Amino acid sequence: MKNINPTQTSAWQALQKHYDEMKDVTIAELFANDSDRFAKFSATFDDLMLVDFSKNRITEETLAKLQDLAKETDLAGAIKSMFSGEKINRTEDRAVLHVALRNRSNTPIIVDGKDVMPEVNAVLEKMKTFSQAIISGQWKGYTGKAITDVVNIGIGGSDLGPFMVTEALRPYKNHLNMHFVSNVDGTHIAEVLKKVNPETTLFLVASKTFTTQETMTNAHSARDWFLKTAGDEKHVAKHFAALSTNAKAVGEFGIDTANMFEFWDWVGGRYSLWSAIGLSIILSVGFDNFVELLSGAHAMDKHFSTTPAEKNLPILLALIGIWYNNFFGAETEAILPYDQYMHRFAAYFQQGNMESNGKYVDRNGNAVDYQTGPIIWGEPGTNGQHAFYQLIHQGTKMVPCDFIAPAITHNPLSDHHQKLLSNFFAQTEALAFGKSREVVEQEYRDQGKDPAQLEHVVPFKVFEGNRPTNSILLREITPFSLGALIALYEHKIFTQGAILNIFTFDQWGVELGKQLANRILPELGDDKAISSHDSSTNGLINRYKAWRA
């Protein structure tokens, strides 16, 4: 994987000139000048997903120049490096192989001279056996009752991914009730424990090292709560399992290491739902549906690794994102799923993107002088329309948006889905084409009103349009299509990081706050005034101590 400053390439210089030509061209003009624009700027994946990127401020020349940038920064080489098991996470000396976890073709993937697939398959088989015992009721709690509730205790990648997927696949769920606890705020675990019965609850403690502060604090609180009823510590083994590699700490906690599900250092946290971290997904929707999720992701992996860049969906979306972020100065991207089950999708890729590409140091160790990762945010439609779409339509910020919707709903209730999708289609049209002053005035005339008498209102009803969007229309949200969609975004993130010459798979930015919190924690143990920090931090700590007394 080469270290190439993208701004020093001839393609970047060409894109700068091209931007000067494109900055005042409107999406409306692009459509008016090309009746085949949709056909040229859209593509389908496996007849399950249509990606329409025609409502963007791009031409074929734009894409060609962006593809030149990908070539000059050796994106193809970076893709090969990842899939071949090269240690592309150089700051931690690790391979990056979440693709191995869903390698359904089972072709060998070599890390340090060893094929990782036998171990991957062994853990999958172990999860299958365990989950079937829980789901069938064969596994009994300490009083002989079957498990009814599962509580996943994790944070970051050990929480966001499984929670997002179990919500997205709720139509496929079985009888088990799923709960997720992440925040070290005691309120989170306390509220979940109010809902469950210690006799019928299984806790999954998801921490690779079994030392994560938030996770272990919650796990010990759950254990204490459980033992208040169960009494004997030997019963912990019937109600706790671990997603970890620290067998010693797992055993000391009271968990049978036979119920410890391992994963590897080449699995990054925010790419770990495909690993043992996905056990909560299996317990929610069953092993077969989890395999379908893996299969969908594997299909997208094959598309990404074998399809020419000009037709490669993750690459195309990544390049368009770089175009807006670095040339138009767009700082954010909104992910807007028109499906209530997908309500955690934007939050999941907020972590996926911002923790991956939120870096200001390039792979050479130098501060960059260009934009790297964007701010990611979003909410389900149509809720967002009544919240923040005002700014997207008429604000002063450019916010490129991804609209996502299924053609087939899991809940065909009356005409709800037609109304939902009518909004999905309408919003991208409105954002692209807007509404001119002439149209506003004509609407007044059609209503029998004199525009001249409403001159003071007319400017406020004008929509400039020219707001870029991608539309991702799925046939239906199934385990397979969801797996493919997640992998699409994962590879988009990787592509941008590779081109922008940053390390996508470390996250040193989370460490400093942890270090300082560990230093401050002992200072909160008494009522002494603190003076060892800056005046602001001292003032905050001392006021906290005064108010808690």
Curated annotation (Swiss-Prot):
Gene Ontology BP annotations: gluconeogenesis; glucose 6-phosphate metabolic process; glycolytic process
Catalysed conversion reaction: alpha-D-glucose 6-phosphate = beta-D-fructose 6-phosphate
EC number(s) given by UniProt: 5.3.1.9
Pathway assigned in UniProt: Carbohydrate biosynthesis; gluconeogenesis; Carbohydrate degradation; glycolysis; D-glyceraldehyde 3-phosphate and glycerone phosphate from D-glucose: step 2/4
Keywords of this entry: Cytoplasm, Gluconeogenesis, Glycolysis, Isomerase
GO cellular component, one term: cytosol
Major localization listed first in the record, in broad terms: cytoplasm
Pfam families found in the cross-reference section: PGI
GO molecular function: carbohydrate derivative binding; glucose-6-phosphate isomerase activity; monosaccharide binding
Catalytic residues in the record: E355 (proton donor), H386, K514
PROSITE patterns assigned: P_GLUCOSE_ISOMERASE_1, P_GLUCOSE_ISOMERASE_2, P_GLUCOSE_ISOMERASE_3
Domain of life: Bacteria
Subcellular location: Cytoplasm
Family the UniProt entry places it in: Belongs to the GPI family.
Protein's job: Catalyzes the reversible isomerization of glucose-6-phosphate to fructose-6-phosphate.
Record's protein name: Glucose-6-phosphate isomerase
Organism: Salmonella agona (strain SL483)
Gene of this entry: pgi
